[in-house]
Amino acid sequence: MAAPIKFPFRPRGGQPREDTTPKRGLRRYLLELKESNKEFWLSGHAVFKLLSLGCMISALDYFETMLPHPVLILLICMEAAICIFFIFLNTLAINRYIPFVFWPMADIFNSLFSCVFLGGGIYFAFKARRLLPKPYLTAMILMGAAAICSFIDMLLQFQHFRGLRLRKW
């Protein structure tokens, strides 16, 4: 086997650079946080999740001025809490540390069920009252806007599956 070539001069290109990313600790987590949530904020998921959350909170505020059925309050609070969970999950990059859950599929199902529950809540709110005062009607419209934002967010989630190939067993 031949000995490696020794150059009398320094070859062009210099030494290969070492990987400067931190291997552990807070600096590594902050770097991963910066890199991992760019897609969430720039692809439109965050905008529609925040719009949906804002509509749900506004609808809850309008419902609180009246005396609605307690199921409507419970429904909106539950959907808002789940929406906040997914916003924190994607913003803090926690989904990288829990690999046994396929998070894009969980987010699609969350958006689908949120759309269905909010639509059912609108139907229930409409059937629960004969007279629809202005704050009650406004809250129903805001619930509809939140359902539409959840549906659009569900459609945006399908981008995760474009390049995905199924395994053949």
UniProtKB/Swiss-Prot annotation:
GO terms for cellular component: cytoplasm; extracellular space; membrane; nucleus. It is found in: Membrane. It comes from the Eukaryota. Keywords: Chemotaxis, Cytokine, Membrane, Transmembrane, Transmembrane helix. One of its GO terms (molecular function) is cytokine activity. It is a multi-pass membrane protein. InterPro entries: Marvel (IPR008253). The keyword Membrane applies. Its main location: membrane. Disulfide bonds: none annotated. The chain crosses the membrane at residues 40-60, 69-89, 98-118, 136-156. The keyword Transmembrane applies. Belongs to the chemokine-like factor family. This is CKLF-like MARVEL transmembrane domain-containing protein 2A. The gene is Cmtm2a.
